[in-house]
Curated annotation (Swiss-Prot):
This is Holliday junction resolvase RecU. It comes from Oenococcus oeni (strain ATCC BAA-331 / PSU-1). One of its GO terms (biological process) is DNA recombination. Its EC number is 3.1.21.10. The record marks K99 as: Transition state stabilizer. GO terms for cellular component: cytoplasm. The gene is recU. It is found in: Cytoplasm. Endonuclease that resolves Holliday junction intermediates in genetic recombination. Cleaves mobile four-strand junctions by introducing symmetrical nicks in paired strands. Promotes annealing of linear ssDNA with homologous dsDNA. Required for DNA repair, homologous recombination and chromosome segregation. CDD domains: RecU-like. Mg(2+) binds at T82, D84, D97, Q116. Residues 1-21 are annotated as: Disordered. Belongs to the RecU family.
Amino acid sequence: MVNYPSGVRAGGYPQKKKNQNIRYGKRGMGLEEMINQANDYYLVNHQAVIHKKPTPITVVHVDYPDRSMAKITEAYYVQPSTTDYNGVVSGKYIDFDAKETKNKTNMPLKNFHQHQITHLKNVLENGGIGFLVLGFTTLSEYYIFPASLLIKIWDKAKAGGEKSLPYKIVSKQGIKINSKMIPSLDYLPALKKLFNI
């Protein structure tokens, strides 16, 4: 597509105006990508060992258009995955999930699944640290939130209560993650503060 300097397209249609309220922080980087970058930084700097858990799948069919270009075309989940990440920080086992929403007022509980809640309960019952990294992308805010509170809210929702995790609760009961250059989502200080580790 060729555009003239005045912004008019070659086809005679004016170029669409772009939204002027652009936030440039963390541009183009999803929550998991930011966490992965932080985890690499923590590992290299001997601050923590945290890895993303692989999703267990069974591959059924693979296309080979070229020897070096295998493409999985059909696969199935072997079992429901638990949480996204686990590892060790200051000698403590940690296990957490990462969720983000564009919603400004709450994190819908439909973003979570029963098997994840059960897994986090098991982690807590066995002395591990379970938590969430929650992102409110429209607000450009990220929080560490304890799994114990999520579990209470989940149980209330199952009994007919509110079907979301309100932003007000997250911002009061969680710890806000401060942005940095490297890593862009430095969640370790917030984690250590919330759990006194």
